[in-house]
Amino acid sequence: MAGHSQFANIKHRKGAQDAKRSKVFTKLRKEIIIAARSGPPTPDLNPRLRAAIASAKAENLPKDKIEAAIKSAQGNAADDSYEEITYEGYGPGSTAIVVHALSNNRNRTAGELRHIFSKHGGKLGEKGSIAYLFDHVGLVVYKAESIESFDALFNLATSLGAIDLEEDGEGEDKVYAIICSVEDFGKVRDGLYAQYSDGELARLSWRPKQRVLVDSPELNTKLMNFLNDLEDTTTYSMLRGTFHLWVSGT
């Protein structure tokens, strides 16, 4: 019986891992489709597509799946008619949250989000109810280990028009985030890519006008559970924020 139970546990864990991997692949595929539709379907001519493909390869999305997603972007299949939608709401502890979603069904996505916010004691808000607490900015992220000189990166970024460069994380998880205006995003991204190749992330994002430290262990746990539920929802490609999400307290 013990052996049978252990085998069942292994199957359960593998099933959970496979399900999580499938969700990640789904998100990556959506991002590739949106990126391919945002410009030329050729990575060399489309920085956003190049970044999406790099992210997909980092997660070991098979090459044939990547190529199929790019090809799908050129078709008219209803299931692949994804659009980018921004939602706003209050999460645990009245933290202001901006969520960026890729969806082919607005009603379904809004319903899923409303359920997640409500489940964690939050509330999905109307358009404009939260966004004023944030600045809409361009964001380019590099792993620190891929940059030889922070000063050289800083000097190049500022010469291209970046307004800030932030550090986050430690060790192999340390990253540099270059912040710029929406208007200068293309110039900053392309200039950085020309010097340092493609980064970990390059897209428009939301930055809080005022940072609030979450120093309550209980609230931190609630926030992490809330964000995990958001990330587990297959209708999202990426959460806006400090390299995935910025939270602005109120």
Swiss-Prot record:
Predominant subcellular localization, coarse grouping: cytoplasm
Q: Report the domain of life of the source organism.
A: Bacteria
Extract the ranges annotated as region (Disordered). Answer: 1-22
Task: Report the GO molecular function annotations.
Answer: DNA binding
Q: Which InterPro entries match?
A: Integrase-like_N (IPR017856), TACO1_YebC-like_2nd/3rd_dom (IPR048300), TACO1_YebC_N (IPR049083), Transcrip_reg_TACO1-like (IPR002876), Transcrip_reg_TACO1-like_dom3 (IPR026564), YebC-like (IPR029072)
Answer whether the UniProt record assigns the keyword Cytoplasm to this protein.
yes
Pfam families (UniProt xref): TACO1_YebC_N, Transcrip_reg
Q: Which Gene3D superfamilies match?
A: 1.10.10.200, 3.30.70.980
Name the GO terms of the biological process aspect: regulation of DNA-templated transcription
Q: Where in the cell is it found?
A: Cytoplasm
Give GO cellular component annotations, separated by semicolons: cytoplasm
Q: Which family does it belong to?
A: Belongs to the TACO1 family.
Q: What is this protein called?
A: Probable transcriptional regulatory protein AM694
Q: Organism classification, top ranks?
A: Bacteria, Pseudomonadati, Pseudomonadota, Alphaproteobacteria, Rickettsiales
